[in-house]
């Protein structure tokens, strides 16, 4: 699985990266905020799983791509840690001029044990309330956070291998998972990432992903898929979508000790696994993974 993959020439299927319909998640949070699986941590952790919002300042804003930025947030002290575990996320909040709360979940891309600060990679969506707000901020402005929220409780060596299927900013939770698995010398799980974007320039966290592949060639592999490589003659990936045939050829089958994690915009989710019904309900498994014979219990939707 980790040998050089043969190039496919599938007909390009554009990976829609339009506005993600996440307003329902906000309503769900406020209706069920006492039911989330919060993670409790020691006193040196900033986020303790309680109901307290913490205002944190932006220390740096960097351009990740033409429509995506990396925000670095400063923790209260240089020795502070987030308090997240694998795999978990945070809620971010701002209050509109009319007094309405806008809340969205975000997965930090920093090392979970990073001290003093953490980073979010955020894509700007046209009409997106939170992303428009964040893109209007500057260093020293603050954002309210709370959490952490457990998404999937990872247990080392639970599976022989896992496959991550992602598109766009869906890479964030997948990268968190991959990074911490391969960096753990006691976790022998092999990680295979299939990551789709419109162009090579849209590939997020590419530097970090390529570094993992170079450092841990026996544990981690990534294959990039783009609709159009444009003028990038150095692009060493696949042109087209992540096809059923490609998955069948390069991903461990449903009878093996494996698990699949999927994250991306709604069209991507519907094509491969179907969307979650809510943050607490994974919904039915449909799409390509269902057609390949994987069961609902073998696929997790971030």
Swiss-Prot record:
Positions where Phosphoserine occurs in the chain: 278
Cellular component per GO, a single term: mitochondrial outer membrane
Binding site for FAD: 158-193
Induction conditions: By osmotic stress.
Propeptide: 1-41
Function: The outer membrane form may mediate the reduction of outer membrane cytochrome b5, and the soluble inter-membrane space form may transfer electrons from external NADH to cytochrome c, thereby mediating an antimycin-insensitive, energy-coupled oxidation of external NADH by yeast mitochondria. Involved in the reduction of D-erythroascorbyl free radicals.
Position of the signal peptide: none
Pfam families to which the protein is assigned, alphabetical: FAD_binding_6, NAD_binding_1
Family as reported in the entry's similarity comment: Belongs to the flavoprotein pyridine nucleotide cytochrome reductase family.
Domain of life of the organism encoding this protein: Eukaryota
Segments traversing the membrane: 12-32
Native organism: Saccharomyces cerevisiae (strain YJM789)
Alphabetized Gene3D superfamilies for the sequence: Nucleotide-binding domain of ferredoxin-NADP reductase (FNR) module (3.40.50.80), Translation factors (2.40.30.10)
Catalytic activity: 2 Fe(III)-[cytochrome b5] + NADH = 2 Fe(II)-[cytochrome b5] + NAD(+) + H(+)
Cofactor(s) this protein requires: FAD
EC numbers on record: 1.6.2.2
Protein name: NADH-cytochrome b5 reductase 2
Gene: MCR1
GO terms, molecular function: cytochrome-b5 reductase activity, acting on NAD(P)H
Keyword field: FAD, Flavoprotein, Membrane, Mitochondrion, Mitochondrion outer membrane, NAD, Oxidoreductase, Phosphoprotein, Transmembrane, Transmembrane helix
Annotated ranges, domain FAD-binding FR-type: 51-155
Residues annotated as site: Cleavage: 41-42
Biological process terms in GO annotation: ergosterol biosynthetic process
